[in-house]
Amino acid sequence: MEKETTFLGLKLSEKGPGNDMVKKALGYSLKYLEIETFMDVIGFVKDPVMTDYFWHIMVDNHCRHLATVLLECLGYEGTYNKQQYAIKRFLKSNRINYSELSSDDPQIDLYPTIKEEMKNMKPNAIACRKWLIIEPREFKKVIMKLNTKNGDNIREYYIRLEELIKLYLEYSLYFKEREAQIEKQKSQFHIETLEKKLDEMKLEAEKRHDELLDKVEEVQYDLNVVGEKLDIAVEDRAPKVKAELLRERFVVLNRNDKRASCQYYVMRGQDHYINGKIFSYKNLHPNLKIIFDISCQPNPRNLFVRFKELKDNRFKVVGNNIQTLDEKALLEVFNKLNDDKRNIQLM
């Protein structure tokens, strides 16, 4: 079932906006669009006068100056005096509050349109002039009650601006939701990248450990050539260790992990050591499988040394790792090498 969130009468869907204009704005840029750009993107037709005046009336609480150009837009034509007479009569008859500012009022500086009108006036005219000021709420009453020839067009445009604000709010909410999802995905990607890097570091450390162990064992093998001849004796010549934890094991593991460069891994050591290593390896490779396990091998190191001496092209040995595409052949070789311990060739 689709989840919806309601905010100030707007229903926000998990599937995204249903309004084509909001979709267009969201698809225009990953950056947040200011209202002017939003209007351009969705193709909103702006009136050079009404857009600016009406927008400020809707979004802020600052009083507005009923400038000459605004009065003309509202439908009050003729000379300045005629305009003033008509608008004042309209305001009084409809009980709409307004105020007047004279040239010596310090609040004059708050209205750039008044300062602009004063530039084209003579000093004596400025001294006698009164400028009409109206609060946003009262100006909305003007729009609703306007009875000039432009009244219907003014109200229609005001309604369109209200619809624009609703669209912009919807766009803003979906934009913030998209930003939150992007940040969430970035965080998840960052976490996954770190986890992947950590796994790679573990695999690399494992590889280096194996290579080092391999070198140590090769040196040890060179020092114990004679001992090897004795270690390959049959089990009745090399009795089993009674304590199970101290018994030697030779184990071949299949990692079953696509991340690993080598799928097969050899472990040699006492039983308790092997069990501990397998437990930790399963945490690193959840699909780990034991494919070859010899318990009580008299000297498991020698078995792997003999395997490497075969130099079989089907197998590539890197440390304790084995690369091969033929697991069956690998098992056959180890079984044969294990059986060969019965063939004693003492010098």
Swiss-Prot record:
It comes from the Viruses. InterPro entries: DUF3627, MSV199_dom. Keywords: Coiled coil. The keyword Coiled coil applies. Residues 178-226 form a coiled coil. The keyword Coiled coil applies. Belongs to the IIV-6 006L/238R/313L/468L family. This is Putative MSV199 domain-containing protein 388R.
